[in-house]
Regions:
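C-terminal motif of bacterial Sec signal peptides marking the signal peptidase cleavage site
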Residues: 13-16
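Sec-dependent signal peptide recognition
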Residues: 2-10
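Short histidine/acidic/glycine/proline-rich micro-motifs that form metal-
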Residues: 49, 88-91, 142
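A solvent-exposed, acidic/Ser-Thr-rich amphipathic alpha-helical stretch
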Residues: 71-124, 130-132
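Exposed beta-sheet edge and beta->alpha loop/turn motif
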Residues: 133-172
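Short, low-complexity N-terminal intrinsically disordered segments enriched in polar/charged residues
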Residues: 18-72, 76
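Low-complexity, intrinsically disordered terminal/linker segments enriched in charged
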Residues: 37, 167-184
Length: 184
């Protein structure tokens, strides 16, 4: 009886120590749905899947180039058909136009961004092609013309194509302040 119980205990021990690596590795290679989106030109929700993590390094290099005012690196990372959509509704199209706007802005301002988080994601567009996106949370700081500090929370939704930044949507929120009033 003692041997029987010992044998059962050993079998249970071996089962509990079984390597689950094979199960986990097949999950990594499969498509993992992490959400859904109504992509431009579509009429129904499209699954959002895990995107290319390597785009995070491109974004970090891009932000560093902005902080360093390095227009050459920014232009190198931008796709020629780059598009930018700001929180105030402004739209800018083209790598050259983007660099000109930044050059003028950098002459009179010293904007800085700090990346706080990034989520690589992808989804099929209206043509069935997988688009690579990176959604990021960033802190933006600068000083206005009166010397007042500017602080905003920015969310950038960035589309990548062939290792280049093709499109950026910028959303912003002011620094949190406790208030007796609350507005939407």
């Amino acid at each position: 009886m003692k041997k029987y119980i010992t044998s059962i205990m050993l079998v249970l021990l071996f089962i509990s120590c079984t390597n689950n690596q094979q199960k986990n590795s097949t999950k990594k290679n499969s498509v993992i749905e992490i959400g859904s989106a109504l992509m431009d030109g579509t009429n129904e929700m499209t699954p959002i899947i895990v995107g290319e993590i390597s785009n995070q390094e491109i974004w970090l290099k891009y932000i560093k180039a902005h902080n360093d005012k390095n227009l050459d690196i920014i232009a190198e990372i931008n796709a020629e058909d780059w598009e930018g959509y700001t929180a105030d509704g402004s739209v800018l199209k083209g790598n050259k136009a983007h660099i000109e706007v930044l050059d003028n802005w950098f002459k009179s301002a010293n904007p800085k961004w700090k990346v706080k988080w990034m989520i690589a994601n992808a989804a099929k567009n209206k043509d069935g092609i997988i688009e690579q996106w990176l959604t990021t949370g960033n802190e933006y700081t600068d000083v206005d013309e009166n010397g007042n500090e500017i602080f905003e929370h920015n969310v950038h939704d960035i589309q990548f194509a062939d290792g280049k930044i093709k499109k950026i949507y910028v959303y912003k929120r002011a620094k949190a302040q406790e208030s007796a009033e609350f507005s939407y």
